[in-house]
């Protein structure tokens, strides 16, 4: 799969699993994304896809790298709707 395609799939999954935050943007906890069976089947390297999407300014999250367990409560926010 190419990066553009994986980022578009990630957007769909954030919309599916997330909810609107106080700013009206869709967000989801990293732990919810990471532990979702459908996401696990779609993304071979979820963290890599998240980093690519952040570089493209499609999403944002605190920090540079998200790790399972440690960052489960970090919000992944979709910047475009």
Curated annotation (Swiss-Prot):
GO terms for biological process: regulation of actin filament-based process. InterPro entries: Costars (IPR044302), Costars_dom (IPR027817), Costars_sf (IPR038095). Belongs to the costars family. This is Costars family protein ABRACL. The lineage of its organism: Eukaryota, Metazoa, Chordata, Craniata, Vertebrata. The gene is abracl. PANTHER family: COSTARS FAMILY PROTEIN ABRACL. SMART domains: Costars. It comes from Danio rerio (Zebrafish).
């Amino acid at each position: 799969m190419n990066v553009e395609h994986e980022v578009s799939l990630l957007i769909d999954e954030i919309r599916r699993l997330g909810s609107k935050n106080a700013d009206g943007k869709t967000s989801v906890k990293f732990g919810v994304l990471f532990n979702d069976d459908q996401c696990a089947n779609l993304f071979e390297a979820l963290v890599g896809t998240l980093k690519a999407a952040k570089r493209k300014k499609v999403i944002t999250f605190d920090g540079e790298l998200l790790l399972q367990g440690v960052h489960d409560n970090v919000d992944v926010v979709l910047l475009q709707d």
